[in-house]
């Protein structure tokens, strides 16, 4: 049995980093990732996701669950390029979670480097594999996946699975949000928009600025998308869950897209999951808010700012009303039930009434 012993030596590590003797640096926790994949693997969550995923392939040389798991692992490591997949597998916990069927890690006897041996899935490997599947397969697989179908899959099928796993709490508190995602200035980014932003990353209209203002350096052009999200909030855990999303061109309005997203989410998970939605003034639309309340029974909360007309209206109404100290009303004393009259008295009164009526 081969046993490897590691000693913590920060000085040695820093020295090697300064000398450039490293291939890949990662901040992810291998143990946490392994526990995470054991949970979604043993619970059948990963296979359930694979069954409903809108795969672009009719024949799968690599299981869909492995492609999804590999993508999730890369997201946990913050890796965006698929050519980093080899490093993610090497230092992550996915291999440990799924055991020898996926592959095995071992230390090289000559130099002590960590090696990976994978069997693969299609029996077409002429050489030893160091990853469960080729990184280029993942790149092509997710590139060929229809973006609209993948978006709908997350907003419906994944949302249903979250509900089945009791991911939504009883408070039913959600937040609607819209943010810009900047990408490199390449027109090949489909449906992207090129907008002018100020120093706080707020879009501005270039037609409303003078040439002098444009030359101050406070404004920059960015190619971007707009991400509209429906977030489920867990106040006691200080975290949130992305319950649904829409990816739009940067110049598109988030207002109609969000309410369509909310309608489809409620249709998928049913009424009662969403009880309150907190929005900013960008989502202010009386007709749509009324529809959400009447159709789904959802309360919409929009914080008021001092520069909003509704705030000024409220302050104006306050000035016209006279206020006085609140006095709690006294509680009325309960009426005491009268005692029933004795039978003898009842007979005398009845006899007296008969006499008076004659």
Regions found by a protein language model. Give the residues of each.
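Active-site-proximal, Lys/Arg-enriched surface segment
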Residues: 135-235
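Phosphate/oxyanion-binding active-site loops and adjacent basic polyanion-contact surfaces
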Residues: 63, 81-82, 222, 250-259
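Short, positively charged, Gly/Tyr-enriched micro-motifs
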Residues: 59-154, 235-236
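Gly-rich Lys/Arg/Thr-decorated short loops/hinges at beta-loop-alpha junctions or inter-strand turns
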Residues: 239-245
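Basic, short loop/linker segments at the boundary and entry of helix-turn-helix/winged-helix-like folds
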Residues: 22-72
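Short, conserved catalytic/metal-binding motifs centered on acidic residues
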Residues: 70, 85-86, 134, 138, ...
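An internal, acidic/charged active-site-proximal segment
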Residues: 247-358
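Double-stranded DNA-binding cores of transcription factors and transposases
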Residues: 3-15, 61-70
